[in-house]
Amino acid sequence: MAREFSLENTRNIGIMAHIDAGKTTATERILYYTGRIHKIGETHEGASQMDWMEQEQERGITITSAATTAQWKGHRVNIIDTPGHVDFTVEVERSLRVLDGAVAVLDAQSGVEPQTETVWRQATTYGVPRIVFVNKMDKIGADFLYSVGTIHDRLQANAHPIQLPIGAEDEFNGIIDLVEECAYMYGNDLGTDIQRVEIPEEHKELAEEYRGKLIEAVAELDEEMMMKYLEGEEITVEELKAGIRKATTSVEFFPVICGSAFKNKGVQILLDAVIDYLPSPLDVPAIKGTLPDTDEEVERKSSDEEPFAALAFKIMTDPYVGKLTFFRVYSGVLNSGSYVKNSTKGKRERVGRILQMHANSREEISTVYAGDIAAAVGLKDTTTGDTLCDEKSLVILESMEFPEPVISVAIEPKSKADQDKMGTALSKLSEEDPTFRAHTDQETGQTIIAGMGELHLDIIVDRMRREFKVEANVGAPQVAYRETFRAAAKVEGKFARQSGGRGQFGHVWIEFEPNEEGKGFEFENKIVGGVVPREYIPAVGAGLEDALKNGVLAGYPLVDIKAALVDGSYHDVDSSEMAFKIAASMALKAAVSKCSPVILEPMMKVEVVIPEEYMGDIMGDVTSRRGRVEGMEARGNAQVVRAMVPLSEMFGYATSLRSNTQGRGTFSMVFDHYEEVPKSVSEEIIKKNKGE
């Protein structure tokens, strides 16, 4: 099967946004206009094409990023719909890794919201070019220029409108195209009656002003255009488009467009903008990787002629075909039935079938080419972030980093039958989602599951019930506290058991000191002159790593510390790896009195949106939860409070906010960083954990 669309005519894009900005609806309309769907499904009726897991249809939010292929004006557009709910940021992170461009959807009433900031930051990390689509222009309180302002203020992004709306709220009935200097008027809400007309007289002045600003902004990034602009020469539509494209693909400029996906206004123009301004796989830098044996850096260009290299970015369990591995092909060609090497794990894999995915239907294809996104059936050992490549030309592409879970709950199966199935369910679910962990607590024997938030874990338990038919009781959520040292000290650990027969002897002096936040545990060997033989040194490191897992104050993992083995002694006969492991863990316990250990807790960035009259109550409530208010602003006729609050104080906040505001307040929160717990709280945590 020959390549259907050239690389220049391929776009891999993500659609990203805050929850409820109308992202799934926008994707839905794109699929409708590109001829993939015959009837439009509304999210609020629970019939959307992209939201195909049962929970998504019930809750009206998108949880797993479904990858869909659509066609528009001779181009193939692969779309990944990403969830906007904060608990699912990992889904966004992994889809951004394999995209070439993205559409950020904003709500015209709210502009940039906290989750938008998180997703925007992630996209900046991966250098993803973006177009901003200001959606819901038909909504009460919709304000296009206010929304553009929030992009400047909150994201510090160089964003400029390339369109202006004609009217707003229920008067929104057209769009001015500043690039082509024309307008599109909508005769109805079905998107079937669109007329391209001259810009209406009453909007001409504003359109000229904003077109001038647009040309100036683009010219600043393009010397040739700047010269023409300064010399007063006219810049043609083609030159302006080329300038916008160049500045957008180099992530220096973000075009802003507007519309209402729900009312079918502006979606076709959004598709045109995706093709005009977002990059093809040829416009983004070639992907870099390393050779497995030498760690030498190599690159793979977007070309069918290069050796095959792809990145697995999502694993899903499908009721009909089993395990599906979604992957992005960076270079080369892959045929179904062929063998590839998983270079990350060093295993050989056979690709059984290759499927091109529509939101929840699929089409089998025999070949995938560079720049494509598809799903493979039959891969056994591949997990998220693994590289698949040609067996004769190995390469390891840069993998993805995932955040550690911040919340955990104990779960127990309701019956013996459930117990057997629960193990399978948990291992499949953790294979699909790298931010979800399941383990057995050594002391209590309970199964503990951990994730990114209450909703995340709710959905996991829900999926266990529906997909794996496992009924389970769920305990109260627990916060993932951490411990760390605030002071440095040199401490001794000595383990000696020598009473007749073969004894045990290990003796170490270790210098502990705090490490930079986020650096984790670092172990260094500073032994001189062999006072501790070389073969026992890894045992000291391993002994410390084991002991760190259970902390020193309240049994939480110790993080961000450095340990240097500086001295010690050994016994020719009685020393063993085990003895040195124990000596190292004794040194860590001895450090408690000298290294000022503290407990750290996850802090959440919280944004509460409430009617003005509840302001006092809500501020008081935030403070009573040990929160720090970091800013307030008016948004339309509502007030927005931004605060930093410990996760432990946020349990059940949704219920309390509902009752405090008669159901009129909403909030969202996202994990921000770890911070030291106040002494009084720390004492309580230690008491509770020691069962006092």
From Swiss-Prot:
GO molecular function, one term: translation elongation factor activity
GO term, biological process aspect, one: ribosome disassembly
Locations listed in the record: Cytoplasm
Main location: cytoplasm
Keyword annotations from UniProtKB, A to Z: Cytoplasm, Elongation factor, GTP-binding, Nucleotide-binding, Protein biosynthesis
Keyword Protein biosynthesis belongs to the record: yes
Family: Belongs to the TRAFAC class translation factor GTPase superfamily. Classic translation factor GTPase family. EF-G/EF-2 subfamily.
Listed name of the protein: Elongation factor G
